[in-house]
């Protein structure tokens, strides 16, 4: 059973150039489309950007110009994983302004990048939480097990008593 949406009817009449993010859920009856957005997905983009060796800007310009077929993208063959650190209480009520420390040590884990989402520097220059999903700890590894170990090793170095993360990221694929 297929359904159409008002947005899909608009897309049938227009040429779309840009990013299209599809949120999917795998069910016992196969994949189901939950949502689609004209933007990059979060945290899906973090793992893609970690693996992308090519400069992203020329690809985005080519996409807008309609010449994306002329761009060659070079990808790192490593596995990648992103563990989101969120404020306690998220997605319901959560506190802003809580202190986050240890990112310098965490960022030194091999193959790891820390992406900021809901952070800011307060007047004293200290990093604080300013949203629900706050950090995306993203790691590469020769396989998913190694990437997962690196990401959680980095998470464990972050001192943020008012934050949490899921500890099951990647387990189905491993």
Regions found by a protein language model. Name each.
Residues 29, 42-45, 54-57, 61-69, ...:
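Short helix-capping and hinge/turn segments at secondary-structure transitions, especially at repeat
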Residues 1-7, 11:
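Single conserved hydrophobic/aromatic residue that forms the stacking wall/gate
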Residues 6, 29, 33, 80:
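Conserved catalytic motifs of the protein kinase core domain
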Residues 3, 16-18, 77, 131:
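Residue-level preference for beta-strand/loop junctions
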Residues 62-174:
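Peripheral (often C-terminal) accessory segments that flank ATP-dependent C-N-forming ligase machineries
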Residues 34-48, 89-91, 120:
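Glycine-rich phosphate/pyrophosphate-binding beta-alpha loops
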Residues 12-42:
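Conserved metal-phosphate-binding beta-hairpin within the catalytic cores
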């Amino acid at each position: 059973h297929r359904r159409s949406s008002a947005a899909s009817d608009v897309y049938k009449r227009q040429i779309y150039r840009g990013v299209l993010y599809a949120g999917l859920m795998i069910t016992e009856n196969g994949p189901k489309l939950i949502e689609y957005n004209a933007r990059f997905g979060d945290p899906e983009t973090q793992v893609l950007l970690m693996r992308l060796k090519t400069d992203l800007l020329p690809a985005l310009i080519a996409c807008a110009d309609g010449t994306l077929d002329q761009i060659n993208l070079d990808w790192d063959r490593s596995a990648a994983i992103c563990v989101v650190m969120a404020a306690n209480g998220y997605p319901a009520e959560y506190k802003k302004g809580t202190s986050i420390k240890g990112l310098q040590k965490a960022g030194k884990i091999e193959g790891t990048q820390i992406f900021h989402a809901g952070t800011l520097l307060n007047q004293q220059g200290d990093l604080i939480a300013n949203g629900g999903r706050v950090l995306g700890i993203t790691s590469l590894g020769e396989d998913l097990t190694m990437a997962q170990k690196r990401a959680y090793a980095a998470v464990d170095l972050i001192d943020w008593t008012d934050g949490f993360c899921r500890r099951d990221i990647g387990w189905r694929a491993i």
